[in-house]
Amino acid sequence: MTKHVAVPIPEVHRYSLVILRLAQVKARTGRSRSSIYADIKAGRFVAPINIGPRAVGWLAHEVDEWITARIAESRGGAR
């Protein structure tokens, strides 16, 4: 039996949720498939969501937040 969990959607994203597929995540981050999945496993990259029986995607705002955090780290803003 499938277990459903209610996930609150932040108000700012309620009507602008965009799901990215792997090719789009690779293009946006400049990273390879293997490095993306290695970092997901290590907890260093956002996890994908299931969008079908054999398909996953990433929420664009989560990927963008990850990119923003990397920029801040590289410029000494976050430690």
Regions found by a protein language model. Give the residues of each.
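Polyanion-binding surface elements
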Residues: 2-42, 61-74
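Short, solvent-exposed alpha-helical "recognition" segments
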Residues: 42-49
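Short Lys/Arg-enriched helix C-cap and helix-to-coil transition segments
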Residues: 49-55
